[in-house]
């Protein structure tokens, strides 16, 4: 690794450390109704919207009403995006004349963006119009992220309130989430535009090629069509809301989505900003910042080794080139390492770092092709996702999924010392433990059963670009990604009706079943009294607590997915080590 690579990684950490507290404090003040510098603008608008909708800011909901409101809102979003894709040929802002999207692909896309997954089985430049991108997909980038944040705040109320039966008002919290996302997205979009990302309603432009070329039919090609569009506004919230769906097919590897090293830095910071700041906000809301920081430290302990392994796997290069005498060492002429599927403006270190960050969160954006990573690099990406998107995770969803693991860890710890388990002053009883267990098992079942079905039928195996262990990895990655609402992919997997429908089902269940169970947990905890810690209570901010949570997460992750990983990336790695080249 060069000095520039180290400086890039350190700069990410420094910027996040500087922004963590002010961003967390801002979110805390927004959700608790305290005054912020944006209150003069947003408070009157919020009051007007709530009045127009017949909702009051002081009207609270129990967890069931909250869940119903969430599902109604989300299903309306799915239906709207589905219909929009089917009628886009009749609507304006369609310079390339995009036609109606096939119904199964349209359903997959609608569910994908509403669930914050942003799995893309289509080419955005040619499949959807500017209007569909703007009022359909970009709007859902805001709304799906806001829903995740809303569920988290309701879950936090479960711990911070006592002897109650309400967990907030869905509509009020939804609006306040938008007040957080909107100004931050605006700033990020301006930065992207300043660096060269397009934000225009003009159609594509035709430019002459520097060197003429021939197409597959032997015809001489002298010009190229370059797609444009209102990209910067969608890219900003795609990153900030950990959505990940690209305006262009190459996603953040495209020079219009991610033009420079500086935009790469901005996009990485945008991905991590809200997830890490939510830990601080969580601590503030339950009355102890150090408890939120303890959760953040646990996430960091899991993250740093994964980041290191991901980078190490790529800077070493591809052993298949060694017998050919091809140098993969870094020099003033090349970045070195495994450069297949990577942009030269980023190199292997920035590409690997981006891939780890986008898979530990639920973002799913890519600045390189994950399918071209070394087996260990691919293993890290898949394992990141399979951990449950809890290492930072998606905005809102990452922290509430992490807290479910904390519940299980504290339950086990309580049983080991022979006392009633408790967390943040709330007792953990069989009902909460059953819900937490189901919460963790649902994505595990979706991933493993979905993969098993796909590898057992022709409709599943015929869509992989590679046979053997890498083909299995492509399928395993796909079902891991959609079930955990990540959205990235090993791009060697193509779409058909089977994958469009099965992945849509996994996305829907993986998002909303988990969210509903989280709300049920919030409803159970909010009704409990807060009990003072006693002798033998595991302090929920001490190093022992952090280590125990990390240990619990790793045990559950290893036991759940090690057999499946052994059939894919682990086998690839062993073949690579044994022969120096991968044969598939």
Swiss-Prot record:
<dbReference type="GO" id="GO:0005886">
    <property type="term" value="C:plasma membrane"/>
</dbReference>
<comment type="similarity">
    <text>Belongs to the KdpA family.</text>
</comment>
<keyword id="KW-0633">Potassium transport</keyword>
<feature type="transmembrane region" description="Helical">
    <location>
        <begin position="292"/>
        <end position="312"/>
    </location>
</feature>
<comment type="function">
    <text>Part of the high-affinity ATP-driven potassium transport (or Kdp) system, which catalyzes the hydrolysis of ATP coupled with the electrogenic transport of potassium into the cytoplasm. This subunit binds the extracellular potassium ions and delivers the ions to the membrane domain of KdpB through an intramembrane tunnel.</text>
</comment>
<comment type="subunit">
    <text>The system is composed of three essential subunits: KdpA, KdpB and KdpC.</text>
</comment>
<feature type="transmembrane region" description="Helical">
    <location>
        <begin position="8"/>
        <end position="28"/>
    </location>
</feature>
<dbReference type="GO" id="GO:0030955">
    <property type="term" value="F:potassium ion binding"/>
</dbReference>
<feature type="transmembrane region" description="Helical">
    <location>
        <begin position="440"/>
        <end position="460"/>
    </location>
</feature>
<feature type="transmembrane region" description="Helical">
    <location>
        <begin position="262"/>
        <end position="282"/>
    </location>
</feature>
<keyword id="KW-1133">Transmembrane helix</keyword>
<feature type="transmembrane region" description="Helical">
    <location>
        <begin position="139"/>
        <end position="159"/>
    </location>
</feature>
<feature type="transmembrane region" description="Helical">
    <location>
        <begin position="507"/>
        <end position="527"/>
    </location>
</feature>
<dbReference type="GO" id="GO:0008556">
    <property type="term" value="F:P-type potassium transmembrane transporter activity"/>
</dbReference>
<keyword id="KW-0812">Transmembrane</keyword>
<keyword id="KW-0472">Membrane</keyword>
<protein>
    <recommendedName>
        <fullName>Potassium-transporting ATPase potassium-binding subunit</fullName>
    </recommendedName>
</protein>
<dbReference type="InterPro" id="IPR004623">
    <property type="entry name" value="KdpA"/>
</dbReference>
<keyword id="KW-1003">Cell membrane</keyword>
<feature type="transmembrane region" description="Helical">
    <location>
        <begin position="398"/>
        <end position="418"/>
    </location>
</feature>
<feature type="transmembrane region" description="Helical">
    <location>
        <begin position="544"/>
        <end position="564"/>
    </location>
</feature>
<feature type="transmembrane region" description="Helical">
    <location>
        <begin position="65"/>
        <end position="85"/>
    </location>
</feature>
<dbReference type="Pfam" id="PF03814">
    <property type="entry name" value="KdpA"/>
</dbReference>
<keyword id="KW-0406">Ion transport</keyword>
<keyword id="KW-0630">Potassium</keyword>
<keyword id="KW-0813">Transport</keyword>
<feature type="transmembrane region" description="Helical">
    <location>
        <begin position="172"/>
        <end position="192"/>
    </location>
</feature>
